[in-house]
Amino acid sequence: MKKPLFVLFCCLSATLVVPESFAQRFVRRSLDRACVQTAQLDSELTDTTLYPTSLDRAGALELKSIRSWVSGFFPGTLWLLYGETQDPSWLWRARRRTAALAGLSSYERTHDLGFMVGCPVGLGLRLTGDKAYERLLVETSETLLKRFDPKVGLIRSWDNKNRQPDPYLVIIDNMMNLEMLFEASRLTGDPRFRDVAV
């Protein structure tokens, strides 16, 4: 009786040792490559108030100011790499790039605060529990509420640049604010953020 149980145990144990699959290798290699490329890009960006957006036709890196709607993408990428690797160098990079975004917490001229601040700060809060990120997320959400019109029930996307009467401009990018607003409501217990989100 002991021998058949031992054989069964050995067979089951052998099935638990699974070699790395093609998909697992692909993911690991992709993450390794992303780390190399992102570290190189970060080392080339000496001004923490400029953010990479794309390459021009000649292949040169295009940078935008902190007020660009994509300013949170690069810090968000750094947070994601830290979350996957737990490498302290990614934590340092993510904190440094996210710190520059703090000035956006009172920037009232955009609806893109979820892209710009919510994503990287939300990731920083989730991965570190840092109360400074909690405050920044709530302050930014307060600013975003200033764009909400209760008569319309929406957050205005764009301001009217020529000061002429126009329709209330709303685009799907506003959906990127929902997670930040829900989180602000959860953190503060203030239902206003949630009410605007729904």
Question: PLM features: residue spans?
Answer:
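Positively charged n-region of N-terminal signal peptides that target proteins for export
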Residues: 1-4
